[in-house]
Amino acid sequence: HKQKIVSRTSKEYPSCIPPFGTDALRFTFCSLASGSRDINFDLKRVEGYRNFCNKLWNASRFIMLQCTQKNLSKVSSKSKEDIWIQIELDKALGSSSEHIENYRFDLATQVIYEFVWEVYCDWYIEFCKVRLQNKTLSKIEKSQILTSLVWTLESILVALHPIIPFITEEIWQQ
């Protein structure tokens, strides 16, 4: 049986496994950690989670380029978009925590992945880009938008840190 695995692995990956990064591999293994005993390991999945890590990195770069300590607000925003993202974040973190408590790491990673990629990056950050270009925006309103972006990113980093510690730590330190 072992020879069969070695032979098949050598045939499928003659030059070893492509380097996708430790965090992408960790995220993949967490996403595969279901109640089933069989794991269908696919390098396309690792590549997809590498893309997720890149998406998180690029989102953090955008936010860091927009922010300084001086332009962050101590007052939370009352805008519909900022309230919406906090509600969505609370739902995602609550659901993810519940899945982790039940040892369903596959479902926990799915919830976080979908929130970060589809809600935070694809919708909220894009909303904020448009809002921040508004010439009539007051300094306080701009500060509240940036604070909401940062606060949500920080919450995401804390939630993801046990799964992908290297990229989250690097982003956090910056």
Question: Each predicted region: which residue ranges?
Answer:
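Intrinsically disordered, low-complexity acidic Ser/Thr-rich regulatory segments
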Residues: H1-L25
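Helix-rich, typically C-terminal accessory recognition domains appended to large enzymatic cores
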Residues: C16-Q174
